Amino acid sequence: RDHLIRHRLHMRVELDSVDLYDDIEEFLRSGKVDLVSFMDHTPGQGQYRDLLLFGDTLKGYRDVTDEEVRDIVRMQQESSKMTYAQIAALASIARERGISIASHDDDSAEKLAFMDGLEASISEFPISLDVAREARARGLHTVAGAPNVMLGHSHSGNLSAREAVEAGAIDV
């Protein structure tokens, strides 16, 4: 049957979702996923390398004290993460099913190399111009967020999408 709209599902896998691993694996096998992103929002790296910025962002969403922010940071930094073998197994399922793989908040050449090993094809929200350029040099499609474009800057103090587009480092 013909449809006017074809919805596509982007599965965003947070690496500390260890307890959901079996569900993630099952959903990837279901045939309903078109794109999977592997994300790690642990404070102190990626989007939130700057812990002060993380704290300010958290305070913007929730009524928390500095002590509560420190506790949240510690808890997130100490939380279990999926192992490389688990991530690689999920990526393998994605590839077998023709699901595109994206990295998220790339902050270094090392992270890009890690994602190369998973055969990712998309770098979603690289956090610096150097990393965006490196991602493109590695053959990844680079993506910036619409709010970043509209605001003219990243809400978390990272790469400006406008700057990256002007530099030819962003594809979408």
Please give the residue ranges for each predicted region.
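Metal-coordinating catalytic core of metallo-dependent amide/deamination hydrolases
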Residues: 1-106, 147
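Active-site-adjacent C-terminal substructures of enzyme catalytic domains
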Residues: 9, 100-172
